[in-house]
Amino acid sequence: MAAAATLRLSAQGTVTFEDVAVNFTWEEWNLLSEAQRCLYRDVTLENLALISSLGCWCGVEDEAAPSKQSIYIQRETQVRTPMAGVSPKKAHPCEMCGPILGDILHVADHQGTHHKQKLHRCEAWGNKLYDSGNFHQHQNEHIGEKPYRGSVEEALFAKRCKLHVSGESSVFSESGKDFLPRSGLLQQEASHTGEKSNSKTECVSPIQCGGAHYSCGESMKHFSTKHILSQHQRLLTREECYVCCECGKSFSKYASLSNHQRVHTEKKHECGECGKSFSKYVSFSNHQRVHTEKKHECGECGKSFSKYVSFSNHQRVHTGKRPYECGECGKSFSKYASFSNHQRVHTEKKHYECGECGKSFSKYVSFSNHQRVHTGKRPYECGECGKSFSKYASFSNHQRVHTDKKHYECGECGKSFSQKSSLIQHQRFHTGEKPYGCEECGKSFSSEGHLRSHQRVHAGERPFKCGECVKSFSHKRSLVHHQRVHSGERPYQCGECGKSFSQKGNLVLHQRVHTGARPYECGECGKSFSSKGHLRNHQQIHTGDRLYECGECGKSFSHKGTLILHQRVHPRERSYGCGECGKSFSSIGHLRSHQRVHTGERPYECGECGKSFSHKRSLVHHQRMHTGERPYKCGDCGKSFNEKGHLRNHQRVHTTERPFKCGECGKCFSHKGNLILHQHGHTGERPYVCRECGKLFKKKSHLLVHQRIHNGEKPYACEACQKFFRNKYQLIAHQRVHTGERPYECNDCGKSFTHSSTFCVHKRIHTGEKPYECSECGKSFAESSSFTKHKRVHTGEKPYECSECGKSFAESSSLTKHKRVHTGEKPYKCEKCGKLFNKKSHLLVHQSSHWRKAI
């Protein structure tokens, strides 16, 4: 492969076109690959575009030419400095290009590019090349002259030169922007036109000789070659033809693409401190300053910086200064880069419009990335864990989880990080340091990002909008979480029970149900909780704070849940009405669920027994009956439950919490259902009526149990004696006869009982309490059943009728005894003589005769 012509500097600091050009022979050209040929073509065209902006090529017969020219052509295509007194060999301009370049460009498209005007280097600006006019103009900027006024770019140019001369070069090394002279990289000067004759060639202005053949329709500018016009149009349209297959980024030149691809392939320079590698030495050298040079330290938070401009930008976080304001919309920014990026919103043409949502983009890459929002395409998959991403940047950040070395370890908890800044931010959790304060409310934060997010609360800014329901959010993560409501996505699954969640935080909280972890401990009483929210709610018991106030009536509550329950008392706007019954709801989801009552739709079917349900959560709860799963465990007594609500209700037994208070008498209850039942006592409301006997009940469950008296149903069987019972509680109480269990013990006399109701009645013997008073005669009773029987004395009510003879009775026990007359049943047997009786009282009278005989 041919060696590239090396860059040569003369004593005067000038270079020529051949110093920056590369020539190949046909033999060498055939050894190049297609990609290398494309790269050579683009680099050559760029060089020609640069040289074409420096003026016309003067003929070699000019008497002054030998003193001005720096090269002449030999047969061996070597480039040499001419000797004194020797004229250069005449050559057609195209012959000077070599055999390969002649095939790349047409003669008419690049005549005049082989000029011999000298290029000058500016050492202050990194040895950049300028022609004579631009070089002298550029030097004027260093010495402070201002030969022109007007545009913002010109003012910035003069300002930057002053800053550069004054020694503040770090400003420009930080920004990374190249200096562009007033004349521009691509000047619109034309080259020679027409045929070359033997007569002396004059160097004339291309505008004067009419050499600008190519015009741009957008900017009305004129160019001498088609290639320069093409480059100019790319700047206007930002045409990006070459796409990187690794990350999807596109470029207008193959050379730019080739340089970019080194990011993915070549990383020769590795940092010994943190292991990070770079493809360019300049980037590597700049990075090393992070570890070595940090001269500028922030007095507010102690953070240090290697560059003054970074330090200056950082200080605006504490001061809140935003010096860069957009003239279009008034939005202000603390960094020039952010301001510059924002201005593109107003200036850039957006040629690429999305057919789905109408959003438009100025770059094809941005348009392509956006379309993946609609298609759901995630082309970048991690080879380590299989996770996929829609954007290469997200994929690249994720890969650091697997690849990055974590050199920075926390001395408190041992957690390690790949970046020192991440370690510093993490350590603030241990120290409690919050250096970033909000000027509006005084609240402070541990990171700048958290402060920015918080400030949107004051500004009312909600830049993240949901495409489904037009709801907007101040944080992107809130939008992502919200969108899962529409999509139904629950990406976080519990490995223990298979339950899935839309947010990772909810999964972490749920997993503590299985592990029993309670990491949040109350400093007052030592009680621990599984979530920080539960701890905060509990602490309000000690402080007496009532942070949640009702906006309607001003009543305050210590728990948010209690406030929500209270707010149901006040009528709310219910914009979703049911067409069947007129009932209204606050959300369309609640309306849809309600409509299944009318349609009878039960879309969720159990695979075990075929039973169907109208709600998915009802199916999940039902399926636990088959599996026996009880995922919710009480941390105090170890008892497990199949529903979270049942666990919450149970935990009030240990905490003695009674959040449901009666507004009439002030009595508190641990369950809302008990409060509702209690309130029926004040109102006398008994909404559930038995169709058989007309009896009224407060609860539907009580009605169902009562109806079994009429239909004779007894679904609960005792496995020990095969006796059947109407309800579950009767069975449980009966089973204690076999086990001998008497869990309710009286502290006064030591007597124990199998039923809580019997125990409560017994306690009234010691206290003398008789809460049930007859309004007719003033007689009081300790038991409600005795009071009910007594009232029938005044009313004459006899609800229990014999189906055989029609006789009625005031008590069910009297009816049971009477029925034995018809059936002949005699259940009471004398153990002495074996005689049978239909009443217990008859048995007792009979047994007394045996006792008298014995006496």
Curated annotation (Swiss-Prot):
What InterPro entries is this protein classified in? KRAB, KRAB_dom_sf, Znf_C2H2_sf, Znf_C2H2_type
Keyword annotations from UniProtKB, A to Z: Isopeptide bond, Metal-binding, Repeat, Ubl conjugation, Zinc, Zinc-finger
| GO terms (BP aspect) | regulation of transcription by RNA polymerase II
Q: Which cysteines are joined by disulfide bonds?
A: none
Against CDD domains, the record matches this protein to: KRAB_A-box
- Note the position of the cross-link Glycyl lysine isopeptide (Lys-Gly) (interchain with G-Cter in SUMO2): K335, K391
Gene Ontology MF: a single term: zinc ion binding
Q: Which residues form the KRAB domain?
A: 15-91
Keyword Hydrolase listed: no
| Keyword Lipid metabolism annotated | no
In residue numbers, the zinc fingers (C2H2-type) are 120-142, 242-264, 269-291, 296-318, 324-346, 352-374, 380-402, 408-430, 436-458, 464-486, 492-514, 520-542, 548-570, 576-598, 604-626, 632-654, 660-682, 688-710, 716-738, 744-766, 772-794, 800-822, 828-850
Write the protein's name.
Zinc finger protein 814
The lineage is: Eukaryota, Metazoa, Chordata, Craniata, Vertebrata
What gene name is given for the protein in this entry? ZNF814
